[in-house]
């Protein structure tokens, strides 16, 4: 197999020429005139308005006039970053919020109510759930299930449909609490 020849590469610049090239551009990191680094497929062409590249009236042109990076339009971008967590911006007082001026406007409350800003608080919700005597339906539950000490009286459910599981297996997992008719148990046999 024939060997490939090395492609002709330009000779490396001497130190003086490199130093001269850098001195023409002020600093090595100063590249305002060049396009931003990165794959061209992701960066895309510079914004154009009326067929003129770099027109300051372009809808996508943002930032200082020297920068040429393409920016995301404001409607498709994320909300502005938070400016701070202090209460200074919102003023002093009980209704001032830590949000200050931001996504929701000047001194506007956030869309989700916090504690003390309307809506049920967590504390009252959990207290109500833990204390069943305060529940509205407790009176119904208390009258439906008699206390364990009293003699059990079976309710006649013969007017209800027959429990499918009881008719197939002979027993039901809900036993006395089943809403359907168990022949011979909670009513006359069939």
Swiss-Prot record:
Question: Which key words are in the record?
Answer: Metal-binding, Zinc, Zinc-finger
Region annotation Disordered: where it falls in the sequence: 1-94, 110-130, 142-161
Under Gene Ontology molecular function, one entry of this record is: zinc ion binding
Q: What InterPro entries does the record tag this protein with?
A: PRR3, Znf_CCCH, Znf_CCCH_sf
Whether Metal-binding counts among this entry's keywords is yes
Q: Which domain of life is it from?
A: Eukaryota
In residue numbers, the zinc fingers (C3H1-type) are 157-185
- The residue ranges flagged as biased composition, category Pro residues, are 37-48
Q: Does the keyword Zinc-finger apply?
A: yes
Q: What is this protein called?
A: Proline-rich protein 3
Naturally occurring in which organism (per UniProt): Mus musculus
Q: What is the lineage of its organism?
A: Eukaryota, Metazoa, Chordata, Craniata, Vertebrata
Q: Which gene encodes it?
A: Prr3
């Amino acid at each position: 197999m024939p060997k490939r020849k090395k492609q002709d590469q330009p000779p490396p610049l001497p130190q003086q020429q490199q130093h001269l090239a850098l001195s023409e551009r002020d600093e090595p990191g100063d590249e305002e005139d060049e396009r931003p680094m990165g794959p061209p497929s992701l960066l895309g062409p510079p914004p154009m308005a009326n067929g003129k590249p770099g027109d300051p009236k372009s809808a996508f042109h943002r930032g200082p006039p020297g920068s040429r990076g393409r920016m995301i339009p404001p409607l498709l971008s994320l909300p502005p970053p938070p400016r701070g967590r202090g209460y200074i911006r919102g003023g002093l007082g009980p209704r001032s919020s830590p949000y200050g001026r931001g996504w929701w406007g000047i001194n506007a409350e956030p869309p989700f109510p916090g504690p003390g800003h309307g809506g049920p608080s967590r504390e009252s919700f959990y207290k109500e759930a833990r204390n069943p005597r305060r529940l509205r339906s407790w009176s119904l539950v208390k009258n439906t299930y008699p206390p364990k000490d009293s003699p059990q009286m079976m309710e006649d459910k013969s007017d209800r449909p027959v429990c499918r599981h009881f008719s197939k297996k002979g027993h039901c997992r809900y036993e006395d609490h089943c809403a359907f008719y168990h022949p011979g148990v909670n009513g006359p046999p069939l």
